[in-house]
């Protein structure tokens, strides 16, 4: 999100993976499929910053963002159940097929290129990275600082037992290479990879969503962004999960629902979307998140991308108030699209005993 500032400037880059047959490829980077790429002009950006500095903003009610003790015995002892644990923001631990998978891991204090400035973590981490089971795979959705944290990536690469497999969008592999991070698999939209697990094979697909990328003023849209579909065994039938990454609302989601036939569980962002005149199209609000839930045909969805950093103008606790209203507007049962407390775990499907 901090990389919004970097979208105000640009310098030509070369896309080493450019394939003219793919509509989302271009010689200097990548495109969205349904809208023009995010190009925040300088007057709009500085208007937003002026409003942030001098306008009225609702206070964060941080006490409303629950934190629960991590169920470490369950997570370390799990051998086949499908579980989900919300660590904060877009960082989620999935256990499926006997594998431990982290999405967009961020255990740092700031979502920023600098350790002394930028959006600070407002709610405490529910666990240290080292307290989790050994991580087998990391799914990175894009390279913004609230999703790709350098310190966390290096800590994971140095974990006991060896580094996880880092599954990353095209171009992010080059950043990993420059950082000396091993065991990286780059993915284009619709690529898939099969991960052998002790409780069965887990298949990971990289899929299109509507967003953008940048970490500097010179690499806008130079690397790809996206979401993930994860399929594995859960008892007698396959279990299918969707991670939307960071995204605006788009026709991509109905396509995903049709192509995969629906999802047992989805991670959908619900925070960082105000002011709408600036963020609409690239960040969903709660109403659009519920529409994604319906479009992808999700049986159960968990709201992410909230409760951790204040990156936009709505208060950190806003989804606690706005998601119930959005569910009611769309006729979605309360139990079908939920919010967790930090550190909360749920068993989604039990393995065959």
Locate predicted features:
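Metallo-beta-lactamase
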Residues: 8-120, 125-131, 169-243, 322-344, 348-351, ...
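Active-site HxH/HxHxD metal-binding segment of metal-dependent hydrolases
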Residues: 107-115, 126-193, 208, 216
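Bacterial N-terminal signal peptides
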Residues: 1-9
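Cap/insert and terminal regions of metallo-dependent hydrolase folds
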Residues: 12-37, 121, 128-132, 136-137, ...
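Extracytoplasmic
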Residues: 79, 87-89, 132-133, 140, ...
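Conserved catalytic scaffold of divalent metal-dependent phosphoesterases
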Residues: 102, 106-110, 187-192, 199-212, ...
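Acidic/histidine-rich helix-loop elements
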Residues: 107-124, 212-220, 274-283
């Amino acid at each position: 999100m901090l990389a919004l500032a970097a979208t105000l400037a640009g310098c030509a880059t070369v896309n080493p993976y450019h394939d003219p047959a793919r509509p989302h490829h271009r010689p200097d980077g990548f495109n969205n499929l349904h809208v023009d790429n995010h190009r925040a002009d300088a007057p709009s950006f500085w208007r937003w910053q002026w409003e942030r500095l001098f306008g009225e903003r609702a206070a964060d009610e941080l006490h409303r963002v629950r934190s629960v003790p991590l169920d470490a015995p369950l997570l370390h002892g799990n051998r086949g159940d499908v579980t989900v644990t919300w660590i904060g923001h877009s960082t989620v631990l999935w256990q499926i097929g006997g594998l431990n998978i982290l999405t967009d891991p961020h255990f740092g204090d700031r979502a920023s290129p600098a350790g002394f400035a930028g959006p600070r973590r407002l709610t405490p981490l529910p666990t240290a990275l080292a307290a989790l089971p050994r991580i087998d795979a990391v799914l990175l959705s894009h390279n913004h600082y609230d999703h790709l944290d350098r310190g966390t990536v290096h800590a994971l690469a140095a974990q006991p037992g060896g580094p996880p497999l880092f599954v990353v969008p095209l171009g992010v592999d080059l950043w990993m290479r420059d950082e000396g991070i091993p065991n990286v698999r780059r993915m284009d939209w619709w690529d898939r990879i099969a991960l052998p697990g002790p409780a069965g094979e887990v298949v990971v697909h990289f899929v299109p969503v509507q967003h953008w990328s940048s970490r500097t003023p010179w690499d806008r849209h130079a690397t790809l962004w996206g979401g993930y579909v994860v399929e594995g065994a859960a008892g007698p039938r396959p279990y299918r999960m969707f991670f939307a990454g960071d995204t605006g609302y788009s026709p991509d989601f109905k396509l995903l629902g049709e192509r995969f036939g629906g999802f047992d569980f989805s991670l959908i962002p619900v925070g960082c979307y105000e002011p709408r005149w600036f963020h609409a199209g690239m960040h969903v609000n709660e109403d659009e998140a519920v529409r994604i839930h319906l479009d992808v045909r999700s049986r159960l969805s968990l709201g992410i991308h909230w409760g951790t950093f204040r990156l936009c103008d709505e208060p950190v606790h806003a989804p606690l108030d706005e998601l119930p209203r959005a569910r009611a507007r769309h006729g979605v049962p309360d139990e079908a699209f939920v919010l967790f407390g930090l550190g909360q775990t749920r068993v989604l499907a039990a393995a065959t005993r």
